[in-house]
């Protein structure tokens, strides 16, 4: 299988999100990279499902709560930016303050 660098990046985000989701299901509080992976994956999948950029941004803010991550993580994650492929092309989606206190 020959993947482009962009496809490899998407695959790594997916894999990291799967690991993070399994840990979250076990009740483990997520660290910074795990939180970023879950939020990024949710945005990428929203775009793939045909959602608008605004909808994808909103979905990114609903993925995690402060109770699901380590104490310092919400303050560390003030912005998540991810390139996602929408029906009308690839766009940079910015999710501000994605982890609500």
Swiss-Prot record:
> InterPro entries per the record?
Urease_gamma (IPR012010), Urease_gamma/gamma-beta_su (IPR002026), Urease_gamma_sf (IPR036463), Urease_subunit (IPR050069)
- Pathway the protein takes part in: Nitrogen metabolism; urea degradation; CO(2) and NH(3) from urea (urease route): step 1/1
Q: Which GO terms describe its biological process?
A: urea catabolic process
**What GO CC terms are in its UniProt record?**
cytoplasm
Sorted alphabetically, the keyword list is: Cytoplasm, Hydrolase
Compartment list: Cytoplasm
Q: What is catalysed by this protein?
A: urea + 2 H2O + H(+) = hydrogencarbonate + 2 NH4(+)
Alphabetized CDD domains for the sequence: Urease_gamma
Organism's domain of life? Bacteria
Query: HAMAP family attached here?
Result: Urease_gamma (MF_00739)
* Subunit and interaction comment: Heterotrimer of UreA (gamma), UreB (beta) and UreC (alpha) subunits. Three heterotrimers associate to form the active enzyme.
Q: Belongs to which family?
A: Belongs to the urease gamma subunit family.
Q: Know the name of this protein?
A: Urease subunit gamma
């Amino acid at each position: 299988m020959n993947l482009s660098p962009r496809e490899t990046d998407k695959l790594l985000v997916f894999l990291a999100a799967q690991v993070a989701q399994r840990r979250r299901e076990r009740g483990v509080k997520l660290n910074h990279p795990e939180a970023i992976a879950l939020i990024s994956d949710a945005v990428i999948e929203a775009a793939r499902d045909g959602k608008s950029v605004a909808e994808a941004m909103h979905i990114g803010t609903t993925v995690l709560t402060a109770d699901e991550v380590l104490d310092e993580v919400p303050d560390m994650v003030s912005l998540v930016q991810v390139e996602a492929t929408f029906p009308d092309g690839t766009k940079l989606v910015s999710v501000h303050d994605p982890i609500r206190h």
